[in-house]
């Protein structure tokens, strides 16, 4: 089973250029998905990545890579990964819904003015 890394291109603590290169070096065969992961709270203070749908965070990229390496060595449970994937998708869906409602609310306020 191919490893999958999810990294955010919007969070302040994530340097996408260096992190992507380091993850590619760690596992050249892994799938890397870049985009908002709806993990904004921790993403303001820590660099993070989702590894096989499991969130990992650290204060530095080097610390994060140590955690990623340890996670990759652990045996994978397909059922657990599927549960985590669904949870991550639901979290993203809720964030998109909140963003949509906020945009609608702001548009209504502009229309009133």
Swiss-Prot record:
Question: Which Pfam families does this one have?
Answer: DUF1450
Query: What family is this?
Result: Belongs to the UPF0741 family.
Q: Quick one: where's region Disordered?
A: 69-113
Where in the sequence does UniProt note compositional bias of the Basic and acidic residues kind?
74-105
> This chain belongs to which protein, by name?
UPF0741 protein SH2399
Coiled-coil regions listed in the entry:
78-113
Key words of the record = Coiled coil
